[in-house]
């Protein structure tokens, strides 16, 4: 059921591509022992994905709707001028160049989400068109996905050499036919600004009919522009400009505002760091760390006091040195202050090799450069 439903909704162009791919890989799948049901499920899944992408939404619905409206409007004229139209059928090569005109169809803004292209013949050439010509013209149409906010302009080329332009606008819900003008429409779209350089596509459409009344297809030129963020300023620098014709007039779209391009040398572009936090810490962070360490020490002291543990005094403290010993040291006679080279000990005997010192012996001071002495203790 899903396959039959998708067959009616998916256009013939896309369905033919899907069928060709399935037929090409059918033998390979069968050689590998894969059931043919898998191919059918793959085809169904492919068509479902195509419909979910909305790439072909309204492809046939708009076509049928426009055909019915044009036929209803010109049905009385066909009955009154049957003889005149029969004469046109006898000489189609003379009438087609004169009647081939590019027309525009305005579609309401509620349908601006997608931009499919529709094949619609001229109102005076309805009787010359058949189902096969419409199908072949639909096979040559392409879908151009435009960014959000851009009014899609669609160009359709029929078998008779007519270029039909379908425009979606927000000024009404009626389909309005307008003749084509030889102008160049330039429309610039700047997406939401993000850090770093982004590309803003500029869609330029050239509408210029060729001599003889036959109009070519629309040329769509993508002009990328580089947007640089420098502090609080935004610079738009155009990179390349492509011209489809040697001489053409460029008319900016209504309401378009282009920021003034400033030289990049005035201010260095701001480089954003995206690989983590900064390399240096602020003074506030350091103060917070110190306060956190102090709080931890206070908590430890409180916990020790609550547990009733008495802190032991560390080793190598100066508690064993009293002031009285210092007084006794200076009151002692026979004091030597010097440097030493060697000190030898044999059991309780010590031998000193002294140098560059002063000694006080029996109340007298002596200065020496070298001295040797023995002692026991």
Curated annotation (Swiss-Prot):
What are the BP-aspect GO terms?
A: positive regulation of transcription by RNA polymerase II; positive regulation of transcription initiation by RNA polymerase II; transcription by RNA polymerase II; transcription initiation at RNA polymerase II promoter
UniProt-annotated binding residues for DNA: 344-345
Cite the GO molecular-function annotations of the record. DNA binding; protein heterodimerization activity; RNA polymerase II core promoter sequence-specific DNA binding; RNA polymerase II general transcription initiation factor activity; RNA polymerase II general transcription initiation factor binding; RNA polymerase II-specific DNA-binding transcription factor binding; TBP-class protein binding
Keywords of the record: Acetylation, Nucleus, Phosphoprotein, Transcription, Transcription regulation
Where is this chain compositionally biased, Low complexity type?
69-79, 89-105, 248-280
Task: Indicate the annotated site residue(s) for Cleavage.
Answer: 275-276
PTM info: The alpha and beta subunits are postranslationally produced from the precursor formby TASP1. The cleavage promotes proteasomal degradation.
Question: Where are the annotated segments for Disordered?
Answer: 69-107, 248-330
Q: Which residues carry this modification: N-acetylalanine?
A: 2
The record's section on Pfam families has:
TFIIA (PF03153)
Q: What is its main location?
A: nucleus
What role is this protein assigned?
TFIIA is a component of the transcription machinery of RNA polymerase II and plays an important role in transcriptional activation. TFIIA in a complex with TBP mediates transcriptional activity.
| Subunit comment | TFIIA is a heterodimer of the large unprocessed subunit 1 and a small subunit gamma. It was originally believed to be a heterotrimer of an alpha (p35), a beta (p19) and a gamma subunit (p12). TFIIA forms a complex with TBP.
State what protein this is by name: Transcription initiation factor IIA subunit 1
This protein's species is Rattus norvegicus (Rat)
